Amino acid sequence: MNKVKKRILLVLLAILAVILVALLVFFGVYFTRIQTIGSMEQLTDYADGYNLYRMDVKYDYSLDDIIDYGIKDDQTMIDAILKESLPLLPVKIKAPSFGCTAFTLTDTDGGVHMGRNYDFRKDTSAMLVYCAPKDGYKSIAFAALDNVSANVPDENIKKKLASLTAPFICLDGMNEKGVSIAVLTLDSEPVHQNTGKPVISTTLAIRLVLDRAATTEEAVELLRSYDMFASSGRDYHFYITDASGDGRVIEYDINGEPRELIDTPSEAVTNFFIRHKDKVLPNQKNDIYGHGRERYDAVLKVFEDEKGNYTSDTVWNAMKSAAQDPDPDAITSNTQWSISYNNTDLSADIVIRRHWNDVTHCDLESKVTTPSK
């Protein structure tokens, strides 16, 4: 009988040891993720429930591990992101979509700004994401929380965990070198390059540039070293600017095969191929070449009207001129956020959902966010 009890005790101790090891492993993996969740803060309080939040990413992540996972489609992209941000947990997210306007302006004091409207017909809260990767540049960036079903991210543990994916689903941002990037949707067939290079998806390209590019030129060369997979069944292009004012549109040639990356200097961009702007008319869709010419023209008109006296107000006037009200039939309607990135002093001013008199200011170096109006 004593031998039986001894064996039972040994089995129980073995089970307890396994459980303890598992708990230690889980706690080791999730300690900094728990810290990240703890840093979450609500910055606005609107009656409609769609707000601006901030989060300081404390956990180490490996962008290379995500890319090395092998992205072939939306599902493998999502699986790769979840494996890195939420290991050991069964969480589901959906692939995001994006619309928008973006532009570069150098003010009369020499400050370089990127103005950015994020337009999408489905309402969303926004997460301001601070990242400081150990092998990359510090950055601020913005994620649409509706894409992870977490418009109120601190509501429950499921939404808090889903928000940990935010570094890899950002739609625009700026790093400590003064490089800003934004993604904008197009109307063409999604690019899916297959030339033998490692594959990145749309939002991973944004994280790649923010973490590793010190200039627009470096960003372009980085993107050239990867094959692009456009996620969510849509095509996209990128707008990149830097502290010198080098603003370029990054597009994958719609008339080429394989669709070669082409960078085109431009003051502004919306939802049409900038290199084919002669084929694009305002207030209509222009087949594969895109739409949104009227917003592009509106931004340039503000630039022309205020030429010689550019200030931060010019940035806001341009964004207001291109902002859009909700339209359930237009995917790139309904401006969700507007941001003036200052590539020179490394700060950003943010307005959520066209609340133009309610501006939140954030500073990249100090990670301080304050209401400025």
Regions found by a protein language model. Name each.
Residues 126, 192-195, 248-253, 261-262, ...:
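A short secondary-structure junction signal
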Residues 218-234, 238:
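Secretory/export targeting leaders with adjacent low-complexity proregions
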Residues 288-314:
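Long, charge-rich alpha-helical interaction segments
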Residues 5-214, 228, 308-373:
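N-terminal mature-domain region immediately after signal-peptide cleavage
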